[in-house]
Design a protein with these regions (language model features):
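Conserved polymerase palm-domain catalytic core
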Residues: 201-304, 312-315, 319, 346, ...
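Surface-exposed loop/turn segments and immediately adjacent short secondary-structure elements
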Residues: 1-129, 143, 369, 375-376, ...
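Short, conserved micro-motifs composed of acidic
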Residues: 39-44, 49, 338-367
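Inter-domain linker/hinge segments that demarcate the starts of reverse transcriptase
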Residues: 53, 57-64, 92-102, 116, ...
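Conserved catalytic palm subdomain of right-hand nucleotidyl-transferase polymerases, strongest
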Residues: 1-2, 69-77, 116, 126-136, ...
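Basic, alpha-helical interaction scaffolds
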Residues: 357-406
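Catalytic palm active-site di-aspartate
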Residues: 73, 113-116, 132, 164-166, ...
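Active-site-proximal segment of RNA-dependent polymerases
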Residues: 33-58, 103-115, 122, 154-207, ...
């Protein structure tokens, strides 16, 4: 493992490095200088009383949905364990769930721990940041969050803008790709200078501000009981990072959402939808200039933390967009790393390109551009550009054929 220019080999040193990294990430409270007046965004308030109803048969129904042998958390219990022993453990589990519903979180921390297992993002990863953290959550906490996720899933479609497709039933990643593809082709056909800004959000799930999350939930109409349960689950959570199969020192969470928790993705997109509302509102009141004389449904595309924004390449729009991103980052903890972002010019002249390079400290790229795993282009793809996709599908065919064999 590398720490700067130093190579460390002892388990104790690597464990200390991993602990420091994640303690500064999830074990440090989010500092907030500003927040957002959500009332100014004009988002509706929903009737969500049904989410606060007592838990009943849905507990057992959720257990029946649990994968039987999925990797367990620190307690070692799998879905199969719950199903096999339900007649024995039913009363205790139902009592524990009822305690949570009533706002009694005493000793919940014992049932809300997790292991983080590190999955390499690339070949020969040598730094902690080059590993993706996946949480293996305690079975009880995972059961409760799955129950809450099942309740919320049916309401997300009406609560989250249509340009966010992640984690919502009957929405697909292709929707976002096609929306951006059609918009960039249309803008190119208009022969007017425009840009597509593709953002990199830093450590998205790990840095969500709990205070901002609760502000968003209350503004949407979530009741006090639901918000209290979310508070209890967040504040009682702890994590140990697995290194060579050995759990490290425990980290008490102070911010962020677990990757591997069934409810976390849904809470995350509710937070991200505020960014969409900010850009939409700025467009409606004329702070951002229109992209075309013809109406374009969305100037921003969101797929989880994947953000793409269409703008006019002028100083006012670019500076305002950076200010909106900065405000959202300060309020929510989700900061755009502009240096790691990309900007793609559409029909831009030399003076436009010079202005873009002066105001946006990010790499400027050309189409075709890989977006959500597919080549985004303003022209018909050549055979050479399509070939990598064909090769990738060909590599998958043997596995697909094996799945069809009985």
């Amino acid at each position: 493992m590398h720490v700067g220019d130093q190579v460390i080999t002892k388990h104790e040193d690597k464990a200390a490095t991993v602990l420091d990294f994640y303690d500064s990430l999830i074990g440090t409270e989010c500092a907030r200088g500003r927040t957002i007046n959500l009332d100014t965004l004009g988002s509706p308030v929903f009737d969500l009383e049904a989410l606060d109803l007592p838990f009943s048969e849905e507990v057992w129904n959720t257990i029946k949905e649990m994968p039987p042998d999925k990797a367990p958390g620190p307690d070692g219990f799998t879905g199969r364990s719950y199903k096999s022993c339900w007649t024995v453990i039913k009363n205790d589990v139902m009592a524990a769930v009822h305690f949570l519903w009533t706002g009694n979180f005493r000793n919940l921390q014992k049932l809300n721990s997790a292991y983080i297992t590190l999955i390499s993002k690339k070949t020969n990863a040598v730094q902690v940041k080059e590993y993706r953290p996946i949480s293996l959550v305690h079975s009880f906490a995972k059961l409760v969050t799955k129950i809450l996720a099942n309740r919320l899933a049916g309401r997300l479609d009406e609560m989250v803008s249509s340009n966010q497709s992640a984690f919502i039933k009957k929405r697909f990643i292709q929707d976002n790709f096609m929306m951006v593809q059609q918009t960039d082709k249309f803008l190119h056909s208009q022969k007017q200078p425009r840009i597509l800004l593709k953002l990199d959000i830093t450590k998205a799930f790990d840095l969500v501000s709990w205070a901002f999350l609760l502000e968003v939930l209350r503004k949407l109409g979530f009741g006090s009981r639901w918000c209290d349960m979310i508070c209890g689950l967040l504040s009682s959570s702890s994590t140990q990072v697995l290194l060579n199969g050995i759990p490290g020192e425990g980290i008490l969470h102070r911010r962020g959402l677990r990757q591997g928790d069934p409810l976390s993705p849904m809470l995350f997109i509710l937070v991200m939808d505020v960014l969409n509302q900010m850009f939409t509102r700025a467009s409606e009141v004329g702070l951002l200039q229109p992209l075309s004389s013809r109406p374009i449904q969305h100037r921003i595309s969101l797929y989880a933390d994947d953000v793409a924004i269409f703008l006019q390449p002028n100083a006012a729009d670019i500076n305002l967009s950076l200010q909106l991103l900065d405000l959202f980052g300060e309020a929510s903890g989700l900061r755009a790393n502009v240096q790691k972002s990309n900007v793609l010019p559409i029909h831009c002249a030399e003076e436009n390109l010079a202005l873009i390079q002066n105001l946006l400290p990010c790499e400027m790229l050309d189409f075709p551009y890989k977006y959500l795993g597919l080549p985004l282009t303003i022209k018909k793809l050549t055979k050479e550009q399509v070939q990598p996709i064909i090769d990738r599908i060909a590599d998958q065919l043997p596995g697909w054929k094996a799945d069809l064999m009985t």
